[in-house]
Every structure is written in C-alpha cells, then in structure tokens.
C-alpha cells in the first residue's frame, strides 16, 4: 500500500491515478503485439512496410505528445493553485494547439509520404515501399484524431482521472483488433485494411473522449469546441514546456532509428534476437513508465500549489515504487523468456542470445533505469525542461547512438554492443538527473506567469 506524508495526494489518490495508467500501457502493448501478428499473416512485405512507417509515425506522435505534456503541466499547476477556470482555459488551448499541429503534420506527411520514406529508408524493396506508402497515406489521415485523443487523455490525467482514458484506450484497441480481423481476413484488403482499422479506431477514441469531456461536474469540462479561439499568452506557456519536450522526444525517436539501422548490419539470428529483446525489455519498463506519467501530474499539482517540498517527497516515493516495479517485472519477464522464445519460433541461436541478454538486463536495469527516467518527470513538471532536453538528447546521441555504432561496426560486439551502449546511456542520465534533483534548483522554477 502507498503511504505518504504529503497533504495533496493520499495513498488512495495515487493508486487511483497510477493503477489505470499501468493497466492502460500494458493493455496497449499487448494489443500492439496482437496487431503486428495479424498484419504479419498478410505477408513479409506488408509487415515490413507497416513496421517502417510506424517508426516514422512514432516521431510524429512524439511531437503531439510533447504539446500534450506541456498542457498537462500547465493545467496541473493551475489545479494545484486551485484555479479551475485557468485550468479549463489552458485545456482549451491545448486542444487547439494539438489539433492545428497534428493536422499540419498529417497534411505534410500525406503530400510528401514518398519523399519521407525514400529519405529515411533508401534501399528497401519496391514491394515494401509500396506497402509503406499505402499505410502511411491512410494513417497520416488519423494524426489529428490521435493527437486530440492524446491531449484529451492527458488533460484527464492532469485532473487526477486516469481511469477514463484507460477505458477509451481499451475500447479503441479492441476495435482495431476487430477491424483487422474483418479487413484482413474477411475482405482481404491487406495493408490498406490494417491502416483503415487503425484510423477508424483512432477516430472512435477521439470522438468518445471529446464527448466525455463535455459532461458537467468534472474538474476539467470542455465544450463548444468550434468556438475555441487562440489565447497566445496561454499557448506561449504551453509551448515553453512543450517545445523542449518535443525536441527531446524527437531526438529519442531519431536515435532509435539510427540504432535500428546499425542493428540491421548484424547477422539474421542477432537481428531476430534483438527484436525479441526489445519487446521483452519494453514490458519490463511499462509499469515504471506509468509511474513517470503519473508523477508529471503529481509534481505539477504540488508546484502549482506552491509546495515544492511535497513535489520532492512524492518524487522520492514514486521513484522507490518505480524501482520496485522494475525489479518485479524484470524477474517475471525473465522467467517467461524460454517459453516465449519457444512459442515465437525463434531459432536456437537467437533464443540463446535472448536468454543471456535478458539476464543481463534484469541484473543491470534496477541500478540505473528508475533514476534515469522517473525523477526527470518531476523536473519537467516544475518547468525545468531545457535541462532535461539537453541531458536526454546529449546522452542519447553520445552514448546510445555513437557508442553503439563503435561497439558494433568497429569492435564487433554484436547485440551486446547495443545493450552496453544502452546501459551507459541510462547511467549517464541517472547521474545528471540525480544531481539536478538533489541540488533543488528545479524547486524554484515557475511555469505559470504572474498575471495568471
């Protein structure tokens, strides 16, 4: 049971915020895995094209997420200051900003889809490129819908209600799976069917959560969407937090693409092993990632209330819980490695690599990952976004990308090189964020402008 000496959030409040977040991330990941398996039944070209486009889509989604994060922090601080009117005004500007940005990104990707894919993935087979172009066109149409849904879900979390986004997300994911079953296996529409199913599920999620936001009696109530007009002072506050976060997230996704291109140089058995390791390692991170998302709301509310010491207290508490979850999920996933490798049909060589690397990850990760990724959310919630951006982007490119290239291309470390670089990246972040957190400069920062 969560115990806290803070006054803004009881243990029950924290459980109500965090448990649905954990459930949502796990469910979404499971549905994403099922989605990939279903598309794979269409053929290698289809699953390869979808995989390539998803790598680009993730970069775009990070841009929308960054704007939503900026809005979450601003709204959470308004709510902490007991200014519900300010929080509702800011929420309207978050929706407007994300809608415009996501619509422009979607239009650009639709018009330039061939140029974008040719630039990022130059040497793919024509069948893969054709599948990717089809998938990119349809999924780009969904950008405004997934952007608005993400912003609306973030606003619910800022208000301390993560249960509704969880339920809407679950419904959308189930619709996507059902749509895949119909479009892929009944109508046999191939990649077009997979993209259409994804887009329709995102439209539904967006429509449902906007309808829910209109209900009176909630902390944040949104209605008359077409009457929303820009409030540049609020938009500036949101983007002051959102832009550095967007740069940080964008650099992270680009760095992942660079690492993927380096891994592609390895033998087939190691590439297959690395794909499985990535999936399993992600599952060990999800509960702690949910803790980090919740901490943005918790620390933001504390800072808005003028109680930085409570923000510090909750950050330490939730980092400890993040540590515990990393240990528990790591052990559980490691115990499942052999059965998963057997069921997935991995070769013996690939399976041996997966078992060895997951043991190493299970041992190393608890020492560095929680400190690398949990306290940084409190820094962002306090407005210390530039420091977070510089540390994260610098560590990603210097250690995860450059060190990975050196270890694999020049020293022949194989998959082990990927994870050595990853561990060094995590350790570097942990050191910088711990120092920043302990020194306390973030506790004296402000997101809300004085005249608000």
Name each model feature, range by range:
Residues 16-35, 138, 172, 201-205, ...:
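Transmembrane helical elements of multi-pass membrane transporters/channels
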Residues 26, 30, 103, 107, ...:
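Hydrophobic alpha-helical segments of membrane proteins
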Residues 47-107, 149-165, 271-337, 369-392:
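Small-residue-rich hydrophobic transmembrane alpha-helices
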């Amino acid at each position: 049971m969560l115990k806290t000496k803070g006054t803004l959030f009881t243990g029950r409040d924290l459980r109500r915020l965090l448990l649905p977040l954990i459930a949502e991330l796990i469910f979404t990941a499971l549905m994403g895995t099922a989605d990939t398996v279903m598309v794979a039944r269409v053929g290698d070209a289809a699953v390869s094209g979808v995989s390539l486009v998803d790598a680009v889509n993730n970069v775009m989604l990070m841009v929308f997420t960054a704007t939503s994060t900026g809005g979450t922090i601003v709204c959470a601080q308004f709510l902490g200051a007991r200014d519900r009117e300010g929080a509702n005004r800011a929420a309207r500007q978050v929706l407007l900003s994300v809608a415009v940005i996501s619509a422009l990104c979607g239009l650009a990707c639709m018009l330039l889809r061939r140029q974008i894919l040719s630039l990022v993935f130059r040497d793919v087979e024509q069948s893969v490129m054709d599948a990717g172009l089809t998938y990119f066109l349809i999924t780009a149409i969904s950008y405004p819908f997934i952007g608005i849904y993400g912003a609306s879900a973030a606003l619910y979390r800022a208000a301390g209600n993560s249960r509704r986004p969880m339920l809407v997300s679950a419904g959308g994911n189930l619709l996507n799976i059902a749509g895949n079953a119909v479009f892929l296996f009944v109508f046999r529409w191939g990649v077009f069917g997979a993209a259409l199913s994804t887009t329709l599920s995102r439209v539904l999620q967006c429509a449902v959560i906007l309808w829910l936001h209109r209900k009176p009696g909630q902390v944040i109530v949104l209605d008359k969407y077409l009457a929303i007009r820009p409030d540049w002072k609020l938009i500036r506050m949101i983007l002051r937090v959102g832009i550095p976060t967007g740069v940080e997230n964008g650099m992270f996704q680009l760095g992942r693409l660079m690492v993927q291109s380096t891994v592609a140089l390895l033998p087939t058995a190691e590439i297959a092993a690395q794909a499985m390791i990535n999936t399993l390692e992600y599952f060990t991170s999800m509960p702690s990632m949910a803790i980090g998302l919740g901490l943005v709301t918790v620390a933001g509310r504390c800072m808005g209330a003028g109680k930085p010491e409570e923000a510090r207290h909750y950050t330490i508490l939730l980092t400890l819980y993040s540590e515990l979850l990393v240990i528990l999920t790591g052990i559980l996933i490691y115990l499942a490695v052999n059965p998963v490798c057997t069921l997935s049909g991995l070769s013996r060589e690939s399976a041996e690599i997966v078992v060895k690397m997951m043991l190493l990850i299970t041992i190393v990760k608890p020492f560095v990952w929680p400190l690398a990724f949990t306290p940084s959310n409190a820094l962002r919630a306090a407005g210390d976004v530039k420091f977070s951006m510089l540390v994260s982007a610098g560590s990603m490119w210097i250690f995860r990308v450059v060190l990975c290239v050196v270890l694999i291309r020049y020293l022949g470390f194989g998959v082990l090189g990927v994870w050595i670089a990853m561990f060094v990246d995590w350790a570097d972040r942990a050191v910088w964020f711990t120092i920043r957190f302990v020194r306390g400069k973030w506790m004296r920062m402000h997101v809300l402008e004085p005249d608000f």
